[in-house]
C-alpha cells in the first residue's frame, strides 16, 4: 500500500515521469528473518503496480536463477541479505537492461 501511494503521488505531481520498481534480492533461506515467501509476496505486490510508465526490475527472479548455480556467499557480502560487488552488478545490469530496452 505504501509503495502504491508513493507511485500515485509521483504520477499525480509529475504525470510524464516514469517509475522503476525493483523487487529485491532473496535473503538466505537459512536465516529466520528472510523467509523466501516474503520476497515472492513483495515481488507480486510490486507486479500489481506495473502499468504504463511504471516498470519492474525483478531481482527476486534473477537471484532465484543465480542460486541454481551459485552459493549465497557468491552473491552477498554478508551471506544473508546484502549484495556483494557481483550482486550489485546484477542490480545495475537489471536496471540498465530495462532503461535501454
Predicted regions mapped to residue ranges:
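Alpha-helix N-cap/loop-to-helix boundary motif
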Residues: 1-2, 38
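Generic structural signal for well-ordered alpha-helices
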Residues: 3-8, 43
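N-terminal cationic-hydrophobic initiation segments that often serve targeting/anchoring roles
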Residues: 7, 11-12, 47-51
